[in-house]
Design a protein with these regions (language model features):
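Domain-level signal for Mg2+-assisted phosphodiester chemistry and nucleotide/NA-binding surfaces
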Residues: 2-139, 150-155, 162
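Active-site glycine-rich loop that binds ribose-phosphate moieties when present
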Residues: 160-169
Length: 171
């Protein structure tokens, strides 16, 4: 018979049994957050970031459990040339420092044991958007279109097939 006020029940889970753990990482979010916390000057190499991803994932498994696999989800960098509508400069997305860095991280992660790299793609909408803060200023007539700079617009890209890959891995 159980004492009154006791939190234990017959059906309570036994958490002392080691379990296999899968760690799922949203690469895009992780890298943004990682840079804001540990790499503000962006001085770390892709190899160091990949090592940190691996180490952090292992630290979340705990000593009493086993790592089944680290699933790292991200998109292949966009590989198209477009012209900024404000500055008319040609942007070669595949040669941007961010794209090169991401590809290097992917290569280092591929070399790690128990890491599954799940890559989606970026869907090209074919158009540029004005940043919301600038749209607000335009609508309130604080600025005019001619006041926009090349940094006030961005090329619209949407992540595709990542959600499906997560669903398949969870099932």
């Amino acid at each position: 018979m159980e004492k009154k006020g006791s939190n234990k029940t017959e059906n309570s889970a036994n958490f002392n049994i080691p379990v296999k753990i899968a760690v799922l990482i949203d690469g895009g979010f992780f890298i943004k957050r990682y840079n804001s916390l540990f790499n503000k000057e962006k001085s770390k190499t892709a190899e160091e970031v990949a090592d940190d991803i691996y180490t952090l994932a292992h630290s979340h498994v705990g000593k009493e459990n086993y790592l089944y696999r680290i699933f790292f989800y991200d998109c292949i960098p966009f590989e198209k040339r477009v012209h900024n509508p404000i500055s008319k400069k040609c942007i070669v997305f595949e040669k941007t420092p961010e794209a090169i860095f991401r590809n290097q991280i992917f290569e280092f992660l591929k070399q790690k044991r128990k890491v599954a790299l799940r890559l989606g793609y970026l869907k090209d909408s074919g158009h540029w958007l004005i940043r919301p803060s600038k749209v607000k200023e335009l609508l309130s007539k604080n600025i005019v279109i001619d006041d926009l700079s090349e940094d006030d617009v961005y090329y619209d890209l949407r992540q595709k097939s990542i959600d499906m890959k997560i669903g398949v891995d969870i099932a």
